[in-house]
Each structure stands twice: as structure tokens, then as C-alpha cells.
């Protein structure tokens, strides 16, 4: 049987989608009207999603809350949290749900056929038959609810989405983004934040929430996607029988209306919060925003991505450089959102002055006019095109299956034209057209039409305001206090009872008979053998090469690693700056602009970084490397190595103006990252009180690095030559053959072809550089808190089990899954209202527990301290134990691209990890019994007794718990 034999479906189109090596089908389910797009190929990492067009009508976050709550039990699978049960007990390679401005998408992926079918079934039942209509408690838990524990207690609001968005709106970037869309689309859905504004989320009623669900969650409004190597006919027959045939077509009014263009540019101002003692100077965000065409235009879709690179994102790009030269903003960047009906292109200057708004706009327009008049740098255009095409061809999306990214890409057009899901995947022809257009005035005309003459635009200014967060908290507290005062004794009693009832609902586990309704694999379905490493030693001109014999589709992945273990702690901040600056300063043959363009024309990227590796065999030996990575088509290897050699051996650090620009940019980006990734920052900072690995992470990427960058910025203004000299000294010290190790990922033939080129580049390096002993370090304080202007916290507690005499075993991987998806999930997220909570046990002994966008502080630390009690009483039945094991294997066996396989092998080589060791750990996981987990209680107790904590977050919450900390200071 073929798709053509399925009477239930109408084939609207079928053709080969060659650019992604797939057979494409566009179908319509006749009875229900469901839309289906299929990409059939030989990729065993299969992907499914169902999406719905869900245009919000207000700022209550109803699409977002529904996305959270549909996965809280359904008709077939009535367990309270099937999402978590699947995370515990499936071999998924992706499992999540996402709310976009105009759609909500529920994707899953797996390499196991039966697992894939199970995931599809649970997700489809979740969206079509959720328990949200039966249990208002689900809405209260995930959305929002009043919380009152006693008649004399303070009335509060809690809820997972509510707290998530409080965290989001603490970020000026989020405030800017929401204001841009509000300014450009006042008359359609894009002016409303589908995620929800915390000010308006509590205005959402249960009834309005259900109305939204019933209106949009119907097959007639659905977009169903299948990708990969599967029996497509069997899946379609099942889909019809189990779900789609149960529904008749229904007219769903979910179309997104186009926003009419404006007669003139709009000017909008907004505010974001900073702490009371923060300076307001140079903290303003300025933006220049234009609506550019529509998302169904294949050429524009790619062309503005290229213009983003050529005009603003690349080093020395004309708009960026003009603004930086005028002293407007520390960080200037572009933004291009093509995932909505009418794409948006923006120029943004971060950390500017509000008084510079007019000058900002004038400089952009004058620069664009000059670019149109004299022509865009053709090398920059070619670099932008090549970079986009290389990324598309390589299809390396990290931990995300490429089939998922292809599917989400489909929605950029499919949502607005039922016949066009694949147009942006068939883009190699578009890239070819764009290359030809470089020699015409095509790009200049785009600038004139869409960025200069276009009045459908806005200028959005977001200014800092001291204590705005506190003002809002006080206003909310007064509003809640007034509301409570207006209630009768009976109404207050009812609120207390509702709070108790919700907690009881949250604490009550799903009945065993409900849990058994969820489909599950068995231990026998797990792969018995670990993925092997590929590390083959070679030597070229006295330099050790570790090569990884892996098929890499004609791309060479090469890393040059240089020993940096003898760098003093006081040098690490400069090394961090050096790492960020290399490749962004001029060299002997190239200006920094030309260097960036050449890199993107001839390679898939040259990146620099540092890599920290504990030596598993010798705890006192710490492997610390400076790393240069490049990816390149074999035919361009010589050019790529020449560019890398220029970067490493001839970089010019005497241009202190350029160094100042880079310091300001790094500082601005760190400010955003320290808050947005506060959980990781807090965990590393906490572990830096005892761990060399974490200390280096903090010194090179975390809070200590931010402090170093601030000092370097000051030093550049007072003694610029000293900074130049230090950077040049780092290059002289690092880049020598006796410090060098090369990692090569590619097959044997590729390596044989590359050897002469590698020998040539090695010969260009000095033979020797004095290498000292491993540097002494001074660890940070064990109990710290860092205040920012957010309304939530990131709460970390850490320790080290190796130094307490315990050993790493595979059971610790299993414990991580158990804690993440059971104890911590229930106590920190479900009951506590935090958006997330995670834990990790490293082979080297470092361990952490950390929450994400958490409304609590001391309560969360108490939850951590009770973990050993939970472990001691851990007594699952065989089915539950198997579920945890399967969930652990899901992370162990995530599919890897060639570069990731090479990187995994290299890490094992540097850390002294053997195949026998990981196979032993795998066996320990596969054969684990409850008593193996219970035996870990003392280990976790030893970790927690270290009592090393770090909290990043709200000033009032930190001050209330000031007794917990030895050091409290501002984050930035």
C-alpha cells in the first residue's frame, strides 16, 4: 500500500525536496481538514509534531498556559504529568512544547520505532483530549493561583508560567522585544505577548482559558508533520483511525491578518528595572525597526539574513561601525525575525544614552544612504551567503534533531499558505540566485525600499528606571492586600481551603493504574554497548595529533589545542578577553573586517575558546587548553589554515580603539548572559569555592570574568599599552609547537589528504615556549548572593563527593534523572512554582542542585537538604525503576553529528576515560536496582554538607535571607 491508496487523505502535492534529501508530501485529511506535511528519508531520528495556529487576543498568556497544561494528563493517559513520565521513561531525542507569537507546537523525536509511536500517541491525546476540562487545579498550578496559608498571612500569586514570565520580563531584552512588536503591529495578534505579561496573567479566568482551547485545538486548525525513516502509510492509517476520523471539519477563524503599513514611523518609549543604586547612564536600548515584506517571499527570507551580516552583524559592518564610532551603544547588533507573517528587521544599540535616540536614527539612515550610493561590500555579501548556505548544508543544530529544525522552518511559510510548507527548505537555488545578485544592485534596492523608504517602522527606546521592580512588587502587594481586605471571612476561608486543596492535589501521586496506561519500552530495548571512541594517535613535526576516523561528509573538523595550565589565576581574565578578541582584530594581511569575510567565504567558521578537563586518573592533574576550532570543506583547507595562522601568529593588539570596542561589546553581552543563564552562572560560582574546573569557568565566562572585563575596560582608558602588551604576551606564550595538540575529525582519506597542509602550518609556529607548573589558585567564598533587578531567583547548592571519599558510578547518572523528574520537579516546580530545577554529578566529583526562575530562596535550599531522606526511602517497583533507566539511556544515546562524535572522543582522550569505563557505567545503569540508588544517600549528604551556595536574584528576597551568606554584592 502507498500513500496514494489512502482514501482518507487528499494528496495536494508530492515532489522530491532535494535540498534535504527527502520525498515531500502535502496532504489534507478529508474528514477533519487537518493539514499534513511529510519529509520521508533515511534519517532514523524520526520527528513528529502537531501544531495549532493560536493568535492571542490579550496579554494573559493563554496560549502559553495551554501549552503547559495540555501535557498534564489526558483521556487515554490520565497521569498528572505524562510529559515528565515520558522524560523519565522514553528514548526520546527531543521532547518539548513551544509557544510562538502565532502558533503552539508539540514536537517529539526518537530513533526507536516503538518509542516514536508511543510518543505520538501520548502527545496527540494530550492536545485533543486533555484533562484541563476536568481539573481546574491544572490551570492553577501551571498558570496562576492565589496562595493564602492562613488568615493573617500575606496573600500571594504563584504559578509556573507566572513565575517564568516574571523572570522573562526582568530582562530589558524581553521588554524591548515585546515593545517592538507592539509598536509595529498594533492591529493584529503580534502586538500581544503570547507568553503572557505577568501584570496581566492573573486576569485570565479559567473559563476564558477553556474557551481559547476549544476554539483553536481542533484538527481543522492543525499542522501535522512527519519526518524520517518510518512506515509513513502505517502512521497515516493509525493517525486517521485513532484521532482524525473522530472529528468533522470545522471552520476555525485563526488566520493572521496583515498589519496595514503606517503613514509615518512610530516612536515608542518604555522602561525596565535596575536596582536602586545602579547608575542610569549608558543603560538605554535604542532600536530602529522595519517590517520587511512577507514570509512567503523566498528571496527576501534569505536576503535579509545576508543583509543582517553585511550591514551590522559582521566585524566592522558599516552600520555597526558608524554607531560605535559615534559612541552610541556598547553593543550594536541586528535582529531579523522571519518566522512571522510580516518579518521584522531591526538595528539595536545596547547601553546607549536616551539623549542619543535622534542621532542613532540619523546615523543609521545616513550610513544606509551611503551604502546604497557606493554599493555594499561584495565580499561581505558573499560571506553572509556562504555562511548561511554552509549552516544549511551541514544541518548541525547541536542537540536538536535536524528534522525538527526543518519542520519548524516549514511553519514559517506553511502557517500562511497551505501549499507552501517546503519553500524555505528548497533554498540552495535561492542561495545561487543571491550569489548572482551580488554583482547587481539587488541588495542596494532592498535597503532603499525596505529600510529607507519604508514608513512601516518604529523607533523603540527602552530606558532604565531605578527600583521599578520594587515599585511593581509594592503595587502588587498593595493590590493583593486591598483585595484580601475586601473579602469576607467566608471568602478568606475559601482561599485558604483552595490553597490547601491545590497542595494536596499536587502531593497526591497518580494512581498506579493510570501510570500503567502509559506505553513503555523494556530494559531489553536498550542498546547494550556504549558508543565507541575513535582516538588514533599520530605525530607531525613533533606535534601529537589525535585523529577521529569518522565519516564527515567532505567537511574537515580540526581543533588546535594549546596547553594553558600554567597561566596564573590573575592572567585568566586577560586570557578570557584574548579568547573573545582573537579573530576580531586585524592581522598582518587582513583588516578585521576582511578577516571575518574571508573566514565566512572559505570556511564554516573559525572559533576560539578554552577547554577545562579534569584528569580522571589523577585528581591533582587538571588539563586546561586554549582551543581553536575550524570546520572547512576539504577543497578549502589550505585557505582555512592560512587564515587561522594569521589569527594566531600575526594578530595586531596595538589598535586600542578596537580593543575598547570589543571590551564594551563583551561587557554588554555578559550583562545579559549573567541574568538569562543565571542558573549555570550560580552553579559554577558556587562550585568555584572548591573546584578548579568551576573556578576556571567562572574566571573565563562567569561573574569573575565580568569583574575582570570591567577592570580591563578601566585599564584601557588609563594605560592602553599595558593591555596591548599583555594580549601580545599571551599569544607569544601560547602559540608554540611544544604546547600544541591537534584533533582531526574525518575519515582516513581526508586525514591523509590534510597531512601536508597540517605540516605546513605547524612549521610556521615557534618550536618552544617555556611551560611552567600548574598555577596555584585561590577559591571563592562558599556562601554568596548576587543582587540583580529581577523578580525571581536562581538558587544553587553544590559540593564534591570525590574529595569526601566516594567514587563515581553509573548509578549517579540514574540518580540525576530520578531527582530531576521526580523529587525536584515535584517540590521545586510543581509545589514551589519555579520554572525549572536541575542537578548534575560530574565524574570529577563536582555536583550541583540549581533552580531556574524560582520565586523562592530558603524554601528551595530546604528542598535540597531533604534529598538524602528521599533517596533513603526510594523504593520504586520494577516498572518505575525500568522507566528511570530508559530515561537515562535517552541522554546516553542521543544521536551525534560527526563534529560532536569527534569532540566526545577527544574529551575522553584528554580526561583519561576509557571505553571499558563507560561500558562499565552503562552496565551499572542497565542493571541498577533500587538499593543501588539508596546507597547513594550518604554520597549526596556529603555533597550537601559542603554547604556551598550561590543565589542570583531579587534584592528583597536576598536581604530577607542575608544570614545565609558570607558575601552579598550586586551582580553587575
Language-model segments: which ranges?
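M16 family metallopeptidases and their MPP-like homologs
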Residues: 45-55, 81-129, 136-147, 174-199, ...
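Non-catalytic, conformational "gating/processing" segments within enzyme and secreted inhibitor domains
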Residues: 158, 210-242, 723-758
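His/Glu-based metal-binding/catalytic segments typifying zinc-dependent metallopeptidases
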Residues: 40-42, 49-51, 162, 166-174, ...
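Active-site His/Glu-centered metal-binding helix of metallohydrolases
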Residues: 62, 66-70, 578
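Long, compositionally biased intrinsically disordered regions
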Residues: 432, 445-533, 671, 680, ...
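A conserved hydrophobic secondary-structure block that centers on an alpha-helix together
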Residues: 72-73, 196, 200-222
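Non-catalytic terminal extensions that flank enzyme cores
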Residues: 1-47
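Generic recognition of flexible, low-complexity loop/linker segments
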Residues: 94, 210-214, 273-276, 319, ...
Amino acid at each position: 500500500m502507498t500513500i496514494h491508496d489512502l482514501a482518507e487523505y487528499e494528496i495536494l502535492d508530492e515532489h522530491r525536496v532535494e535540498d534535504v534529501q527527502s520525498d515531500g508530501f502535502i496532504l489534507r485529511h478529508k474528514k477533519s481538514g487537518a493539514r499534513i506535511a511529510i519529509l520521508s528519508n533515511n534519517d532514523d531520528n524520526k520527528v513528529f509534531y502537531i501544531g495549532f495556529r493560536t493568535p492571542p487576543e490579550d496579554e494573559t498568556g493563554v496560549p502559553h498556559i495551554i501549552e503547559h497544561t495540555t501535557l498534564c494528563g489526558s483521556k487515554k493517559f490520565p497521569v498528572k504529568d505524562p510529559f515528565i513520565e515520558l522524560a523519565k521513561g522514553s528514548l526520546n531525542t527531543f521532547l518539548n512544547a513551544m509557544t510562538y507569537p502565532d502558533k503552539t507546537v508539540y514536537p517529539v523525536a526518537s530513533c526507536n520505532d516503538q518509542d516514536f509511536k508511543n510518543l505520538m500517541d501520548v502527545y496527540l491525546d494530550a492536545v485533543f483530549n486533555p484533562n484541563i476540562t476536568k481539573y481546574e487545579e491544572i490551570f492553577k498550578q501551571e498558570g496562576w493561583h492565589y496562595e493564602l496559608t492562613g488568615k493573617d498571612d500575606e496573600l500571594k500569586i504563584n504559578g509556573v508560567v507566572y513565575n517564568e514570565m516574571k523572570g522573562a520580563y526582568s530582562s530589558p531584552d524581553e521588554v524591548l522585544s515585546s515593545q517592538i512588536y507592539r509598536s509595529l503591529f498594533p492591529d493584529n495578534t503580534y502586538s500581544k505577548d503570547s507568553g503572557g505579561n505577568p501584570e496581566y496573567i492573573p486576569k485570565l479566568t479559567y473559563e476564558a482559558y477553556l474557551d481559547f482551547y476549544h476554539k483553536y485545538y481542533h484538527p481543522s486548525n492543525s499542522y501535522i508533520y512527519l519526518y524520517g525513516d518510518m512506515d509513513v502509510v502505517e502512521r497515516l492509517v493509525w493517525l486517521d483511525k485513532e484521532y482524525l476520523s473522530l472529528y468533522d471539519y470545522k471552520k476555525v477563524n485563526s488566520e493572521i491578518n496583515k498589519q496595514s503599513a503606517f503613514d509615518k514611523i512610530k516612536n515608542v518609549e518604555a522602561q525596565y528595572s535596575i536596582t536602586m543604586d545602579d547608575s542610569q547612564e549608558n543603560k538605554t536600548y535604542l532600536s530602529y525597526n522595519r517590517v520587511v515584506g512577507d514570509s512567503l517571499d523566498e528571496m527576501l527570507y534569505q536576503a535579509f539574513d545576508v543583509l543582517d551580516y553585511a550591514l551590522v552583524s559582521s566585524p566592522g559592518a558599516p552600520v555597526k561601525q558608524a554607531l560605535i564610532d559615534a559612541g552610541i551603544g556598547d553593543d550594536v547588533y541586528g535582529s531579523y525575525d522571519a518566522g512571522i507573517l510580516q518579518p521584522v528587521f531591526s538595528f539595536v544599540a545596547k547601553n546607549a544614552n536616551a539623549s542619543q535616540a535622534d542621532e542613532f536614527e540619523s546615523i543609521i539612515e545616513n550610513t544606509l544612504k551611503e551604502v546604497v550610493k557606493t554599493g555594499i561590500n561584495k565580499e561581505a555579501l558573499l560571506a553572509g551567503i556562504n555562511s548561511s548556505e554552509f549552516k544549511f548544508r551541514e544541518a548541525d543544530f547541536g542537540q536538536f534533531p535536524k528534522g525538527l529544525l526543518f519542520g519548524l522552518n516549514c511553519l514559517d511559510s506553511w502557517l500562511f499558505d497551505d501549499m507552501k510548507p517546503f519553500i524555505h527548505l528548497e533554498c540552495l537555488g535561492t542561495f545561487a540566485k543571491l550569489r548572482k545578485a551580488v554583482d547587481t544592485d539587488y541588495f542596494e534596492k532592498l535597503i532603499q525600499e525596505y529600510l529607507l523608504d519604508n514608513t512601516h517602522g518604529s523607533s523603540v527606546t527602552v530606558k532604565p528606571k531605578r527600583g521599578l521592580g520594587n515599585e511593581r512588587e509594592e503595587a502588587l502587594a498593595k493590590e493583593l492586600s486591598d483585595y484580601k481586605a475586601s473579602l469576607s471571612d467566608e471568602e478568606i476561608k475559601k482561599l485558604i481551603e483552595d490553597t490547601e486543596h491545590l497542595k494536596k492535589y499536587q502531593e497526591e501521586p497518580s494512581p498506579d493504574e493510570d501510570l500503567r496506561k502509559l506505553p513503555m519500552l523494556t530494559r531489553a530495548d536498550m542498546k547494550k554497548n556504549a558508543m565507541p571512541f575513535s582516538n588514533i594517535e599520530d605525530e607531525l613535526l613533533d606535534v601529537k595529533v589525535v585523529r577521529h576516523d569518522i565519516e564527515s561528509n567532505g567537511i574537515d573538523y580540526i581543533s588546535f589545542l594549546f596547553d594553558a595550565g600554567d597561566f596564573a589565576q590573575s592572567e585568566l581574565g586577560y586570557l578570557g578577553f584574548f579568547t573573545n578578541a582573537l579573530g576580531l582584530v586585524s592581522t598582518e594581511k587582513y583588516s578585521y573586517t576582511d578577516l571575518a569575510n574571508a573566514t565566512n567565504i572559505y570556511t564554516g567558521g573559525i572559533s576560539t575558546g578554552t577547554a577545562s578537563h579534569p584528569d580522571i586518573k589523577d585528581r591533582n592533574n587538571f588539563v586546561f587548553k586554549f582551543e581553536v576550532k575550524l570546520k572547512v570543506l576539504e577543497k578549502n583547507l589550505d585557505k582555512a589554515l592560512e587564515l587561522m595562522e594569521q589569527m594566531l601568529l600575526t594578530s595586531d593588539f596595538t589598535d586600542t580603539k578596537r580593543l575598547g570596542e570589543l571590551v564594551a561589546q563583551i561587557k554588554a553581552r555578559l550583562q545579559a548572559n549573567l541574568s538569562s543563564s543565571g542558573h549555570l552562572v550560580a552553579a559554577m560560582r558556587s562550585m568555584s569555592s572548591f573546584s578548579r574546573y568551576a573556578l576556571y569557568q567562572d574566571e573565563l565566562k562567569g561573574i569573575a570574568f565580568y569583574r575582570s572585563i570591567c577592570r580591563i575596560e578601566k585599564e584601557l582608558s588609563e594605560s592602553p599599552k599595558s593591555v596591548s602588551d599583555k594580549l601580545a604576551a599571551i599569544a607569544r606564550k601560547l602559540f608554540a609547537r611544544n604546547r600544541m595538540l591537534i584533533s582531526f575529525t574525518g575519515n582516513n582519506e581526508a586525514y591523509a589528504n590534510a597531512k601536508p597542509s597540517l605540516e605546513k602550518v605547524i612549521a610556521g609556529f615557534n618550536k618552544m615556549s617555556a611551560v611552567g607548573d600548574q598555577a596555584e589558585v585561590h577559591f571563592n567564598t562558599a556562601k554568596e548572593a548576587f543582587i540583580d533587578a529581577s523578580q525571581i531567583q536562581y538558587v544553587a547548592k553544590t559540593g564534591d563527593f570525590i574529595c569526601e571519599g566516594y567514587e563515581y558510578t553509573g548509578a549517579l547518572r540514574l540518580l540525576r534523572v530520578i531527582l530531576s523528574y521526580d523529587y525536584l520537579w515535584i517540590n521545586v516546580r510543581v509545589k514551589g512554582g519555579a520554572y525549572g530545577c536541575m542537578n548534575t554529578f560530574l565524574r570529577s566529583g563536582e555536583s550541583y542542585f540549581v533552580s531556574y526562575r524560582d520565586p523562592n530562596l530558603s524554601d528551595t535550599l530546604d528542598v535540597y537538604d531533604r534529598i538524602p531522606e528521599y533517596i533513603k526511602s526510594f523504593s520504586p517497583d520494577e516498572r518505575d525503576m525500568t522507566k528511570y533507566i530508559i530515561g537515562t539511556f535517552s541522554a546516553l544515546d542521543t544521536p551525534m553529528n560527526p563534529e560532536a562524535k569527534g569532540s566526545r572522543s577527544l574529551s575522553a582522550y584528554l580526561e583519561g576515560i576509557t571505553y571499558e569505563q563507560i561500558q562499565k557505567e552503562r552496565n551499572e545503569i542497565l542493571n541498577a536496582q533500587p538499593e543501588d540508588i539508596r546507597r547513594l544517600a550518604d554520597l549526596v549528604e556529603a555533597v550537601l554538607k559542603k554547604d556551598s551556595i550561590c543565589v542570583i536574584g531579587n534584592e528583597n528576597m536576598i536581604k530577607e535571607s542575608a544570614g545565609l551568606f558570607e558575601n552579598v554584592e550586586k551582580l553587575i
